Amino acid sequence: NEYENLIVTRTLSKAFALAGIRCGFAIANENLIKAMLKVIDPYPICDPVAQIAVQALSDHGVEMTKERALKCNERREKLEADLKALPFVKKIFVSFGNFLLVEFTDGPAVFNAMAQKGVILRSFETKKGLKNCVRISIGSEAELEELMRYLKALEI
């Protein structure tokens, strides 16, 4: 209401875990929505996708998404605390997402050792200013326990 020209867009991909349906939505004042409706296709998404989106955005769907996000945040906080105890962790960047970016004393060694164990991480070694950095996605409790078991066994 405060900004007549503001449009907020959101995707159902990440938080709602619906990347495959390729659907999002816009929130704006009524006049902007009316203008948008004049230029979009009459049927911009197929019926099955619309039905899934309606379910995801229902009270129950939103509540489930909030619960998943809270649990992900809890697992991220635990992982961060566990990583801080490792002697070869130099820095953990602030994160509000479903991952942690971690600077290790030897990022490539950590990345390669985890890859040999079948743990998929993402190296940021070649990104400017992120030498020795590895991104760790927040998985299930069991996956994170396995990751920590492997990391604790490393000799770096």
Give the location of each predicted region:
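PLP-dependent aminotransferase class I/II
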Residues: 5-83
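A short linear hydrophobic-aromatic micro-motif
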Residues: 8, 87-91, 119-125
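Short acidic/glycine-enriched loop/turn segments that link adjacent beta-strands
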Residues: 20, 96-97, 128-132
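Short beta-strand-to-loop capping motifs
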Residues: 28, 102-105, 138-140
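Conserved PLP-binding catalytic core of the aspartate aminotransferase-like
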Residues: 72-73, 83-117
